[in-house]
């Protein structure tokens, strides 16, 4: 059964996901993250009506392993491997990284049927 998840995200990463420049969202294994599965829908708070389909979920032991496998451009476009590793380790220190590194492959959904409060006049 498809579930809808509502999460927070920084504006720069939201814009990259929506434009398709960034296709992978990285999180660690907090309980709410572990619930996300292929086929679910993710929406991000504070950016209006937006939905992303979860195309796939992959799990890694470390951030470095994830970057080596997935590639930097899909995760943090425009950064070098070293800069991406540093950025993600600042967001997720070792104690959080130990929860598992979750990679969510997301695709922005074009919504033909938006709620009335979001419809244009």
Model-identified regions with their sequence ranges:
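Short beta-strand-centered aromatic/proline hotspots
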Residues: 50-59
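Glycine- and charge-enriched low-complexity intrinsically disordered segments
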Residues: 71-114
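Compositionally biased, charged N-terminal/linker segments
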Residues: 1-36
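Short, charged beta-turn/beta-strand-edge "cap" motif at the junction between a beta-strand
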Residues: 29-31, 46-51
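Short, solvent-exposed secondary-structure boundary/capping segments
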Residues: 58-75
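Ribonuclease/tRNase effector modules and their secretory precursors
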Residues: 3-5, 15, 99-109, 116-121
